[in-house]
């Protein structure tokens, strides 16, 4: 009888080394970094003339990336003699970078720094004890950060320039279902490009460019992303149709929730997503269904990240199922 052995990732069917995969992910993020600095730094400074506004995006991005490296080093230095090489191979800064681009520009910097440090430290310590990685560190960090914001200062994606020109944050309007106010803020194209209040470095148009690049470089689990986005698109569109909402409002919901960014850089995270084609598709569908429940129906601002964490629990079963199917096809 043939045995099925499931190992820890990353599992991307490519001849690329892991460090090259992470390098490609960083390259895909570069346009978003530039966008974040321009829209939430340079443009804001040109209107407010406040030098602090100019450097806010840069500080948030750099410090979040650095604290990822520091946490990786501290948690791994005792057991790994080649920790510096390991950090370089894993591109440890990517966790903090991906998290930072998803945050409000005016978030107190200490919140993501503390959370990112603790999440990476806990991840490394736990993974060494059980020899596997149970949860998506990016999703966990974002879940904790948004949970803290939700119960303290509240979640608001407006930068200081937008605060003077726009009364309401589109993200909160979507949670309340205020379609009329959303149409006043911008057209569908504005939401797609990112020319509205949104996360620090999220532009769905630029994310899709990065996604295409990653597919070409075979550095992303595209089945996870596509099945996740398609599931959400179909369900959100159907719910909107039942409610009599305009089709464009359904699309705006997807863009405001930053679902495209989450689908490309969070849900399909290299180490914490399934390893076979069928399990990748099923995983994306599960995350999509859970996201509908927590984010749309229950209106939890951190619902999508909670969905990813819960879906992580199904990965071993999905991989086992996918491996069995693959084995049958092989026989």
Predicted regions and their residues:
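N-terminal signal-anchor module of multipass membrane proteins
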Residues: 1-69, 73, 327-331
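Small-residue-rich segments of transmembrane alpha-helices in multi-pass membrane proteins
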Residues: 91-101, 139-153, 231-239, 258-265, ...
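Loop-to-transmembrane alpha-helix initiation sites
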Residues: 134-139, 251-259, 280-282, 298-309
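Conserved mixed alpha/beta catalytic, RNA-binding, or beta-rich assembly cores of soluble enzyme
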Residues: 204-205, 216-248
């Amino acid at each position: 009888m043939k045995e099925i052995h499931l190992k820890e990732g990353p599992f991307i069917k490519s001849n690329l080394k892991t460090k090259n995969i992470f390098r490609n992910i960083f390259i895909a993020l570069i346009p978003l970094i530039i966008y974040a600095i321009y829209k939430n730094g340079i443009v804001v400074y040109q209107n407010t003339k406040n030098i602090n506004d100019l450097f806010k995006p840069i500080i948030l991005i750099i410090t979040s990336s650095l604290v990822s490296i520091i946490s990786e080093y501290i948690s791994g230095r005792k057991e790994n003699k080649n920790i510096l090489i390991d950090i370089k191979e894993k591109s440890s800064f990517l966790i903090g970078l991906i998290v930072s681009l998803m945050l409000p520009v005016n978030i107190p910097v200490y919140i993501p720094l503390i959370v990112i440090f603790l999440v990476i430290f806990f991840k490394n310590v736990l993974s060494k004890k059980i020899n596997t990685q149970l949860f998506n560190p990016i999703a966990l960090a974002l879940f904790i950060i948004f949970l803290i914001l939700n119960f303290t200062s509240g979640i608001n994606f407006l930068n200081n320039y937008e605060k003077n020109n726009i009364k309401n944050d589109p993200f909160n309007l979507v949670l309340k279902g205020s379609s009329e106010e959303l149409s006043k803020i911008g057209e569908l194209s504005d939401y797609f490009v990112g020319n509205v209040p949104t996360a620090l470095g999220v532009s769905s148009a630029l994310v899709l460019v990065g996604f295409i690049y990653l597919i070409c470089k075979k550095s992303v689990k595209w089945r996870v992303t596509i099945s996740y986005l398609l599931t959400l698109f179909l369900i959100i569109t159907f719910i909107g149709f039942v409610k009599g909402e305009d089709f464009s409002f359904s699309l705006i919901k997807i863009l405001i929730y930053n679902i495209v960014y989450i689908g490309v850089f969070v849900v399909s995270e290299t180490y914490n997503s399934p390893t076979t084609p069928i399990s990748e598709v099923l995983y994306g569908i599960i995350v999509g269904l859970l996201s509908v429940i927590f984010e749309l129906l229950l209106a939890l601002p951190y619902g999508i990240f909670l969905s990813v964490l819960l879906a992580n629990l199904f990965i071993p079963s999905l991989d086992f199922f996918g491996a069995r199917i693959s084995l049958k096809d092989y026989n």
